[in-house]
Amino acid sequence: MAAAPTRRLTDDVPADVERRLRRLCLALPDAYEEHAWVGTRWRVRKRTFVHVLGVDDPVDGAHVVMTFRAAGAELEALRHAGPPFHVLGWGRDAMGLTLDAATDWDEVAELVVESYCVLAPRKLVALVDRPDPT
C-alpha cells in the first residue's frame, strides 16, 4: 500500500506578503530577520516571534502560513477560532494563520506585536506602543 502524499514546506512566499511582514516586524525594538530552515523568520534575542513559509498540501493546495505566539485568553480564543487560524501541534503557545487575499492586515499587525511581546524581554516590551485593551 502506497503512503499518503504529505504536505511540503517551501520558501514560496509572495514578495508583497514578505514585504508587509518585514515592515511590521522590523518596526519592533531589536527585531531582526533571517532565512529559516524554510521561509523567513523574525526574531528578538534569538527567539522567533513570526515565521512565514509556503505549504504545498496535496489536499488543500499551496498556501502561505504565518506562525506566531499568543498567550492567555487570546491564545484560547485563537485555538477555537477555526480557519484561517490553526493550532500547529508544537509549542504550547504556537499558532498558525493562513495568509491569503482575505487576510485582515490590521489583525496581522496586532498578532505580530502580541507575538513579539510574548517572547521579548520586559524592557523591550515596555518600548512597544500597544493598544489600550479598554
Question: What residue ranges belong to the model's regions?
Answer:
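Charge-dense, helix-prone N-terminal extensions
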Residues: 1-134
